[in-house]
A protein has these predicted regions:
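Structured-RNA-binding interfaces characteristic of tRNA pseudouridine synthases
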Residues: 1-193
Length: 193
């Protein structure tokens, strides 16, 4: 599934927390069999909500673009053998920036009232054989990032032209979307409050 490098949660308590360090150690003791660890605690106001108070979320998607997969990062990157054109990927990714109706990328079981979202930044970079696609927005609809990456893959492989890519985006019809990119290569990198 999707990974989180940095995630936030909140809880209400009437009890005074006098030693944050001890609480972190205790929580991590009970979580030691899970793929999760508590890094820190911060006191917040009563109206704070870990999900709804977020100003920005940053996701990254990792693509291993090489003939051979990375054995160490299996189930952590999407291994794509076909060469992806980085210049075309960047051009396509730039089309996502701004306020748009992202209905094309919306999961059929999405409960969001609206598919209109504002993406403040999308970047595509490459280091050796690893392509990193970064998305920044206040919020995303269900499956949006994975759907957008799936469409970028088609574009990068030259299965689609930039014209076709934009037509699919503007169609607002899920049926026109490329297949979803796998969840195992998607990471919630950071939440900004």
């Amino acid at each position: 599934g999707v990974h989180a490098i940095e995630q936030s949660a909140h809880f209400d308590t009437k009890k005074k927390i006098s030693n944050k360090s001890n609480l972190i150690k205790s929580l991590n003791f009970f979580l030691n069999k899970k793929s999760i660890s508590i890094k820190g605690l911060k006191k917040k106001t009563l109206n704070f909500h870990a999900r709804y108070s977020a100003k920005k979320r940053i996701y990254i998607y990792l693509i291993r673009n090489h003939i051979s997969p990375s054995v160490i990062n299996i189930n952590r990157e999407w291994h794509i053998i076909n060469n992806l054109d980085l210049k075309i990927l960047k051009k396509g990714a730039s089309k996502y920036i701004g306020t748009h109706d992202f209905s094309t990328y919306r999961a059929s079981n999405c409960n969001s009232k609206s598919a209109v979202r504002t993406i403040s930044k999308v970047s595509v970079s490459k280091s050796k054989n690893l392509i990193i696609i970064t998305f920044e927005s206040k919020s995303f609809i269900k499956s949006q990032v994975r759907s957008m990456v799936g469409c970028l893959k088609y574009l990068g492989e030259k299965k689609w032209t930039i014209k076709k890519f934009v037509e699919v985006f503007k169609s607002k019809k899920r049926i026109n979307c490329a297949p979803l990119a796998p969840a195992h290569a998607l990471y919630l990198k950071k939440i900004i409050y």
